[in-house]
Regions:
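Conserved catalytic-core helix/loop/strand module for nucleotide-ribose chemistry
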Residues: 2-6, 11-201, 207-303
Length: 303
């Protein structure tokens, strides 16, 4: 029997746990600085690190992918450029992110966080689908709340050395096709898309629906108001009101429907850990009850 509930984890989940994996921390890290210095004499038209640094005001991981896309667009106006050099820089960017995340301290977990509470709930229900857009290894957390086998990592993991970085499918110079996530050998979107469309309840925790991940979610919001859609409720857990506004903006871009139309088709709620943490805990406790009931149904013998 297919699980009726799907959980999507984004970088906000890691941050809520207390893991220092923010995009800003990466840009300020010695790993990024090292490669910035290595390419300091590289011409502007092929200096990917310098381009990303100049656009660092975007403070989510969607920022690096947005910068890569903008860089690809920028090169369209250049007749000749060293794309082999750009690919070399891109691979070093992947290396820098991997090194930065390898140094994350898993011992400073906030055990009172909503994210930790959610892990405790999910541990009880093996029938729940869990997808993570993070590279981090939850199995390294104290107490091993969830084995990695329970989580499908959309962008790969550091442990498996198959991390995916890049942009959504779009028209860019053919020589820069290595920027596209779909060109990665470990790219997997089919399972996530099919699972989302079959789910009755979906929880996005710390994922802003950033446009760099639009390939994964366009189908969800395109089909959400169709008669055959299974989706009944979608919850989003974000940090604050600013994150909520960004979320709504991204949903508007992804969907053929207005937010009002979507809310006529499904129950859609946004919870903010910074503004009203009590409401987040209440939602998760109700989710716990819902999963308990669905687990009983899931395990019922046939006949």
């Amino acid at each position: 029997m297919f699980s009726q509930t799907t959980i999507i984890l984004g970088n906000g989940f890691d941050l809520d746990l207390g893991l220092n994996t923010s995009y800003k921390s990466f840009i300020d890290s010695k790993d990024f600085e090292f490669w910035m210095k290595e390419y300091i004499d590289t011409p502007d038209e092929t200096n990917l690190f310098d381009y990303i640094f100049k656009q660092r005001l975007i403070d989510t991981w969607g920022g690096v992918e947005a910068s890569i896309y903008d860089f690809a667009e920028y090169t369209k106006a250049i007749d000749r450029f060293d794309y082999e050099m750009i690919e070399q820089e891109f691979r070093h960017l992947e290396d820098a992110i991997a090194e930065f995340l390898k140094e994350v301290d898993y011992n400073n977990i906030i055990f009172t966080s909503c994210a930790w509470h959610l892990l405790g709930i999910l541990r009880k229900y093996p029938h729940v689908n869990i997808f993570s857009f993070n590279y981090t290894d939850i199995a390294k957390l104290p107490g091993t709340p969830l084995p990695n086998s329970r989580i499908k990592h959309i962008h790969g993991t550091l442990t498996e050395k198959n991390a995916i970085l890049g942009i959504q499918d779009c028209k860019i110079r053919q020589e820069l096709s290595f920027f596209k996530k779909s060109h990665h050998t470990n790219y997997m979107s089919k399972e996530l898309i099919e699972t989302l469309n079959k789910s009755e309840r979906i929880l996005f925790y710390g994922h802003s629906m950033c446009l760099s991940d639009m390939d994964y979610f366009t189908s969800l919001f395109k089909n959400i108001c169709r008669r055959e859609s299974n989706i009944k409720r979608i919850d989003f857990v974000v940090l604050d009101s600013d994150a909520e506004k960004e979320l709504y903006k991204n949903i508007d871009f992804l969907s053929e429907h207005t937010l009002a139309e979507i809310r006529e088709c499904v129950d859609l709620f946004v919870f903010k850990t910074k503004d009203n943490i009590r409401a987040v805990f209440e939602m998760m406790n109700k989710l716990d009850m819902y999963l308990s009931e669905s687990a009983t149904f899931f395990c019922m013998p046939r006949g």
